[in-house]
């Protein structure tokens, strides 16, 4: 899979409802220059965190299995996404085995997927795109651009206080850098 980042700003009409408060999100640029919407608690001291725990991702809203898209297929897609997300975040900060002191908890949701040049599609079309992209890619299939809509909350591993929120369209690379870039 080639990494691809959409150049389109995330439109408020595409917000999934996964994050509790979208009003604090502000436009920003990722280290690679891609647009993101994010909020970081101005009081957060990133230096007090030494590890990150990535919760299992979820589709939001949750799709229902069909005769075309089985529960097993949906599980394969999230398994692949989880592995890729842990690999990418683990390249930035050590992974923790669970929440706790000094740990940032990442709570991610897959909210949209696109495998074409037309831009990100709303959630309704995810199953078709995921069948062709997520599963084929997970099984070593064709090489193509895959844009993913991601919403994530970053929580304190002890208090569960929201430290940051992010909403972006990308191939889930450098998620932690998007949230907490180094100066």
Predicted regions and their residues:
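Post-signal-peptide N-terminal segment of Sec-exported extracytoplasmic proteins
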Residues: 26-52
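N-terminal segment of the mature soluble domain
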Residues: 43-109
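Surface-exposed short loop/turn segments
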Residues: 87, 91-161, 178-179
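A short acidic/glycine-rich loop-to-helix N-cap element
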Residues: 175-183
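A short acidic/small-residue loop/turn micro-motif
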Residues: 170-172
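Flexible, active-site-adjacent loop/turn segments at secondary-structure boundaries
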Residues: 17-20, 35-37, 44, 111, ...
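Bacterial Sec signal peptide processing site at the extreme N-terminus
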Residues: 1-23
């Amino acid at each position: 899979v080639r990494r691809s980042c959409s150049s389109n700003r995330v439109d408020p009409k595409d917000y999934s409802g996964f994050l509790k408060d979208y009003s604090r999100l502000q436009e920003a640029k990722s280290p690679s220059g891609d647009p993101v919407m994010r909020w970081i608690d101005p009081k957060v001291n990133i230096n007090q965190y030494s590890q990150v725990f990535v919760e299992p991702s979820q589709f939001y809203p949750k799709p229902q299995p069909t005769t075309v898209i089985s529960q097993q297929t949906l599980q394969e897609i999230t398994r692949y996404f989880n592995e890729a997300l842990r690999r990418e975040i683990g390249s930035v900060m050590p992974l923790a085995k669970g929440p706790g002191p000094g740990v940032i908890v990442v709570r991610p949701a897959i909210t949209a997927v696109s495998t074409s040049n037309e831009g990100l599609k709303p959630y309704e079309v995810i199953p078709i795109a995921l069948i062709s992209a997520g599963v084929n890619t997970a099984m070593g299939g064709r090489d193509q651009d895959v844009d993913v809509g991601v919403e994530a909350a970053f929580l304190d591993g002890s208090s569960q206080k929201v430290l940051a929120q992010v909403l972006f369209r990308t191939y889930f690379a450098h998620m932690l850098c998007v949230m907490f870039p180094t100066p």
